[in-house]
Amino acid sequence: MSASTSTSTAASQDACYISLLGLAEYFRTSQPPNIKKCIQCLQALFTFMPPSKVEARTHLQMGQILMAYTKNIDLARQHLEKAWSISEPLPNFDVKFDTASLLAQLHLQTDRNSHQAKAMLRRAVELSQNNVYWHCKLLLQLAQIHASDREYSLASELLAVGAESADEASATYLKVLFLLSRAMILMIERKTNDVLALLNSAGQIIDNNIPNPHQKEYLKVFFLVLQVCYYLALGQVKTVKPSLKQLQMSIQTIMAPNWPSDEAIFGANQLEMFVWLPKEQLYVLVYLVTVSHSMMAGYMDKAQKYTEKALTQIEKLKQQEDKPILSVFKVILLEHIVMCRMVMGNRELAIREIAAARDVCMAAPQRSLLRRHSAQLHCLIGLYSMSTNLFEHAERQFVVCVSETSERDLKLFANLNLAIIYLRTKRDTDLKQILDAVSTENTHTYSSQALMGGFYYVQGLHAFHKNSFHEAKRFLRETLKMANAEDLNRLTSCSLVLLSHVFLSIGNSKESMNMVTPAMQLASKIPDIHVQLWGSAILKDLHRMSKDVQHEKDAYANHVKYSENLIADQRKCVQSAHHELVNWFQGDPPVTSGPPAAPVLLMPESSVTASVPVIASTSTAMQPAGQYGQFY
C-alpha cells in the first residue's frame, strides 16, 4: 500500500471517528436523550479497529454513559476495565486517571468493602506523579474513602502529601484546600493542638496569599466553618460567637445575586477546579452550625427557626438534584430538632422527627447513612424513653449507643444519661461503676466543656440524692463556673434549680430563692419545661414557708399547668405508632406509620444563615448537656 493510500485511509478513519463521536454526543444531548443510539454510535467505533488511545477513550466514554444513564453496572465495569488495561501502560495519557477515578466510584457502589477502590486509586496515584491536577484529584478521592472508613491517619497522610504537591506546583488555593481538609480530619481525631496549628497556618495564607477575592472569600467560609466547629466541639459557645458572626457575613456575601457562579470562579485554571462544597450547600451548612450553636447556648426557639429554614432550603436543592450530602444535612438537623422538642416538652413531635430521621437513613443506598447514624438514633430514642419514664427501654438504648459508637463525646453523653437512670432507679453499684469509668476516661483527655460540666452536674445530683449537700454544692458550683464562662444557658438553669433544691433541703430559703429565680428566668427564655416544672415546685414550697399565700397559689398554678402539658403530651406519645421505636435494639429500625414530622414552614430568607464530605472534591459535625431528668 502506498504512503498516500495509507494517509488517505487514516484520514478517512479519523473522519469516521469524529462523525460517530459527534453523532453520539448529538443523541446524548437530545431532549429527551436517546441513550440507546448514543451507545450504538460509540459501539460502532470499535468496528474500525481504532488506535489504542482512541479505543481506550471510547471504552471510557461507554463506561461514563452507562453509569450516568443506565443501571447496567456490569457492562459499565467491563468497558472501564478494558479502558484501564489499554491506557495504564501508555505514557502521558490522562484517560487512565479518569478511568481509575470512575472505576473506584463504581467499586464503592457495588462492592461490600472499599479494598478494590483503594487499590485502584493507589496505583493511579503512583502513575500520576508528573500530572499535578490528576495527582491531587486522586489523592483527595483516596483520602475521602479512607476518611469514610474511619482510617483517619491514612487520610491525613494523603492530604499532607497533597499539600506538598500543591505547594511544589505553586498552587496556593489548592494547597489551602488540602490544609483545611486535613484540619477537618485532625478535628475528628481530636488532635486539637495540630488542628489549631493547621488552621492558623491556613488562615495566614488565606489573608496574605490568595489574590483572587472570590476564591479568598470561599476559602474563608471553609476556614470559618472549621473554626466554629472546633470551638463548638470544645463546648465554647461564647468564644465562638465572633467567628460565627463572621461566617454568617461571609455566606451572605457568597450568596448575593451579584456573586459569580462557582464555574466562573473555579473554571479558569485546572489547579483551581476544586471545591469543598458548592455555595448552595455551604449555605445549608452555615444554617446547620448556627442550629448547633443555638442548641448548645440553650436558645431552642432560635434553633427551631433555623432548622425550619435549613430544611426548606434542603428541599429546594433536592428538587434540583438530590445529592447524598443533602440527606446527611437533613439527618443532622433532625437530630438537633428532636433534642429541642424534648427540652420544650414536645415529645410526641420528637418521636415523629426521630421516625423522619430513620426514614432518611433507610432511603440512603446500601444503608450507608443508617450505619453512620444508628448510634445517634438509639441515643435519641433513649432520651425519648427516659422522658416518657420507660427507664428499662432507655437503658438498653443507651447501652446499644455506647457499643455502636466510636465517638467519645457521644459515648460520654450516653453514659451520663445512663448514670441518671441508675440514680433514679436506685442502682448504686451500676452508678458508681459508670461514674468511675467516665472519670477515668476523661481525666487526661480533651472533652467538650458542656459535657464535662454535665459530668459535674451528675455528680452533684448524685451527692444530693445521698443527702451529701456540701459535696453537692461543690460539684454544682464547678458546673456553674464552666456553664457561665461559656454562656451554656441550659446547663446554668439546670444547675441553679438543683442548687436551689439543695439549699431548700438544708433550710436556707433565702439562698434557695436566690438560685431558683434566675433558673426560672433562664428556663422561660430557653424555654425548658422540665426546669420550669421543677422550679415552680420549689417556688411553691418557698412561698408557703414565707406564708406568701398569693405567690404560693401562682406557683402552684404554674406547676399544675406545666404538669398537665407534659401529661397530655405523654398521652399522645403512647398513642403514636412511632412509639414502637422504643423497642428497636438491633438491625434495621422498624417501619412505623403515623402522622409525618411537623411540616417545614416556608419563611422569608434569613439575613444570617445556619457527617459534610471530609475532603474537598473537584468542581464537577455535638450534644449539649442538661437537666435532672436527662441530658439533651
Swiss-Prot record:
The alphabetical list of record keywords is: Cell cycle, Cell division, Chromosome partition, Mitosis, Nucleus, Repeat, TPR repeat
Each TPR repeat, start to end: 453-486, 493-526
List the subcellular locations: Nucleus, Nucleoplasm
Among the record's GO biological process terms, what is one? maintenance of mitotic sister chromatid cohesion
- UniProt cross-references to InterPro entries, sorted A to Z: MAU2 (IPR019440), TPR-like_helical_dom_sf (IPR011990)
In Pfam terms, one family for this protein is Cohesin_load
An annotated GO cellular component of this protein is: nucleoplasm
The source's domain of life comes to: Eukaryota
Location (main, coarse): nucleus
| Subunit organization | Interacts with Nipped-B to form the cohesin loading complex.
Family in the record: Belongs to the SCC4/mau-2 family.
Which PANTHER family does the annotation name? Answer: MAU2 CHROMATID COHESION FACTOR HOMOLOG
Q: What name is this protein filed under?
A: MAU2 chromatid cohesion factor homolog
